[in-house]
Amino acid sequence: MAVKIIVGLGNPGPKYQWTRHNAGFMVLDRLSHLAGIAISKKTFSGVCGEGNWQGERLILLKPQTFMNLSGRSAAEAIRFHKLPIEDLIVIHDDLDIPFGRVKLKQGGGHAGHNGLRSLAQELGSGDFVRVRVGIGRPVHGDVVNYVLNNFSPEEMASLPRLLDGVVDLVEMLAREGLPKTMSLYNNKDLI
């Protein structure tokens, strides 16, 4: 049975719960609910849950270090479990993808995303799988305020469909691997 560490990026605390920057946390919470894997154990500078789902062993991790230091948490988990970086799946928000769309990528730069920057620094490589959840760019105004603000009411209405779609993608990714999942889901509108 393969083991995958799935890290959702976000900021801890109720203040950030519904912000665009917490898309990774939201997906992980939905996956946790559907898979019956409680994310409650305080470890690896985060909260973690482990269990079997759809024939795969999953370790679900939500760093509690705030976005800019997320890499420390993921690196602790990878080292403890002695897993290669190829078994790491990171779910994060992406400004360059319209809301409701998702893209997959193996490796690459951080594109200004501080959580990805921290991961690459702490792991010594950016060669992990990324599930990029589109949040779109602000039409006007500051990007920082945009990502740290809650989704709009219209977006909130579509969020359950988006989260369920990303969970389906993650399930396929853990079971079938990146190439097959990319061919089905890359740049797909999930809402």
UniProtKB/Swiss-Prot annotation:
Broad class of enzyme this protein falls into: hydrolase
Highest taxon of source: Bacteria
GO annotations of cellular component type: cytoplasm
One protein family per Pfam: Pept_tRNA_hydro
Example of a GO biological process term: rescue of stalled ribosome
Reactions listed under catalytic activity: an N-acyl-L-alpha-aminoacyl-tRNA + H2O = an N-acyl-L-amino acid + a tRNA + H(+)
Residue sites binding tRNA per the record: 16, 66, 68, 114
EC number in record: 3.1.1.29
GO terms of molecular function: peptidyl-tRNA hydrolase activity; tRNA binding
Chain positions of site Discriminates between blocked and unblocked aminoacyl-tRNA: 11
Keywords: Cytoplasm, Hydrolase, RNA-binding, tRNA-binding
Site (Stabilizes the basic form of H active site to accept a proton): 93
Keyword Hydrolase: yes
Primary location group: cytoplasm
Catalytic residues in the record: 21 (proton acceptor)
Keyword match tRNA-binding: yes
Subcellular localization(s) per the UniProt record: Cytoplasm
Transmembrane portions of the chain: none
UniProt cross-references to InterPro entries, sorted A to Z: Pept_tRNA_hydro, Pept_tRNA_hydro_CS, Pept_tRNA_hydro_sf
Its job: Hydrolyzes ribosome-free peptidyl-tRNAs (with 1 or more amino acids incorporated), which drop off the ribosome during protein synthesis, or as a result of ribosome stalling. Catalyzes the release of premature peptidyl moieties from peptidyl-tRNA molecules trapped in stalled 50S ribosomal subunits, and thus maintains levels of free tRNAs and 50S ribosomes.
HAMAP family per record: Pept_tRNA_hydro_bact
Family note: Belongs to the PTH family.
PANTHER family, per the entry: PEPTIDYL-TRNA HYDROLASE
Subunit structure and binding partners: Monomer.
Protein name in the entry: Peptidyl-tRNA hydrolase
